[in-house]
Amino acid sequence: MLSSNSEAVSTLNMAVRYKSRGEEQRARTRKATIIMGMTMPNNANGLEALTRTTTDRTRCVNAENPQGGKGRAAMTASQLGPSRKGTPCLKNIPSGQDVILADLSGAGEIRHIWMTVTDATSPTGPNVLRNLILECYWDGEQTPSVSVPLGDFFCCGHAQACRVESVPVAVYPRRGFNCFWPMPFHNGARIVLRNRHNEPIEAFFYQIDYVEKDELPEDVMTFHAQWRRQRVTELGQDYVILDGVHGRGSYVGTYLALTALESRWWGEGEIKVYLDGDKDYPTWCSTGSEDYFGGAWSFAGQDPDGRMHEATYSGAYMGFPFHSRQLDNRESQYWDADTPVTRGFYRWHIPDPIIFASDIKVTLQQIGVDEQGYFERQDDLASVAYWYQQEPHQPFPQKVLETGERDRRPR
C-alpha cells in the first residue's frame, strides 16, 4: 500500500513516460527513489510538488469560460446581476449534435475533468450515459485518441451511475464524474461531446482543469481510451479488449461492464496480454476474472440470513462497484425494471503498468464453472481499455459513433 496519496499520483504520472535510453540516463532524468518496494519519481505531480516553483500556467474550461481565457471566467450576468452564475452549464444540446468542450492550443496537460448530466431525459430516453460519446484529440490528429460512452469512461457502464473511489476515476453521489488521468499534449487538444441520445440534453455541466506549458519532453506519451462491446460473445472465442496498437507505450487500465446471460459462476476466464510479437500464447495473464479485479473466491459474502451474495467494493486501483438485478432508471407502468445480472469492474495498472515496445493485445476468456466443472460461456461484455503510447496511433476498429443505439443499449 502506498504511504500517501501523493505517492499514488506520482506513480500515475510515471506511466506517462516511456524509457528508451540506458539505465544511467534514466537515473538522471527520473531521480527515482524506492518507496515501499516501488520505484517513484521525485518530480511528478503530487503533494511534494506543491512546495516548488513552476512556470506552468493554471487554466480551466467550462461553460463560464469556454475558451479558458485568463481573466475571462464568470463574465455572464444572471438575474442576480453581473458575473453571478450566468452560464453554469450547456443547455439544450439537440440529438445528433456535437459540442466542442475544449479547444486548446500549444503545449499543456489536462489534470482533472469533472462532468455531470442526468441519466435519463424521459421515460423513453433512459440511456443517456451510453448515448453521450466523449472523444479527445491530441496535437491536431484527425482520429480520436479517446472515444468512449460517457458513463463507461467513468466506470459507470450499463447507463447507470455508481459510486467509484479510485485514484484516476472517482464518481460521487448523484453522478459527480471525476477523472484524474494525466492527459498531456504537445501542440493542442480538442475534447468533443457527441450527443447520440434520442432526445435533447437539457443541461450538461463540466469543467476541465489544465496547465499550459512552455513545452513537454519528447518522451511524454499521450492518453488513449477505447470502448468495445459484444452483445453476445462467441462461444470458445476470447473477447478482445484491445488490439491493433502499434508503437511504444504502457497499458494502464481496464473497465468491464458484464451482463450474465447464463446461470452459474461466470468468472473463471483469464485476462491475457500479448506483448511485442506474442502470437499463440501471451506473456502476461491472470488466474481468473475476479482475481484480475482484485477479488477472490467469487467475491463471496453472506447476507444476514446466510445466503451467499457478491460483495462489492471500490479501492484505489481495483474495484467491483456495481452489481444489480434492476436498473432503476427504466421503470414503467407496464413492466418492472428487472434485468439479467449486471456487474461493473475496474483495474488500474498504475503501480504496475504493462509496458510494451512495439504492440499489445488484451483479451478475456468467457469461462464459467458449475457442478460438473469448467464450461465455455456466452455473455454480454462491454469494456474500456486505457493506455499511453507514442503517436501516431492506429484508428480504432470499433467506432462508437458508427454503432447503432441498440448496439450501445444495456440489457
Regions found by a protein language model. Name each.
Residues 3-6, 10-13, 17-21, 26-30:
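Low-acidity, Ser/Thr- and Arg-rich intrinsically disordered low-complexity segments
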Residues 35-411:
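Beta-strand-centric surfaces of beta-sandwich/beta-rich domains
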